[in-house]
Amino acid sequence: MFNEIAGGVDDSGNQYYETIAGGSGATEGSDGASAVQVHMTNTRSTDPEILEHRFREIRLESFRIRHGSGGDGKNKGGDGVIREINFLEPRKVSIVSERRKIPPYGVSGGEPASCGSNLLRKVSGEEID
């Protein structure tokens, strides 16, 4: 399963839609990769400069590795990301994601990774997860 977010339209009518990176599982011989597109081929996160130039109502406030979120073990699972997006105008936003209640499991003695989370913070300060 992949994680994706959609919301916003640029001046040409193109919609904002992107897959959200995560961590890949470890293998028998190496740690997993952090902040990568795991199950979607031919996709990547939009560069912040491109995102903000094309979609002027969107600001990427933070995009960083979520250190410690990958599962521990002989070889550690890759860490996910934190991506904080600020919509400067009212928008309808959709997100499709998984592993928010049940963590990614560990195999061959590895520990589970941390659950992901989605948080919507409204202008009023109300938070919805």
Which residues make up each language-model segment?
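Glycine/proline-enriched, intrinsically flexible loops and inter-domain linkers
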Residues: M1-D129
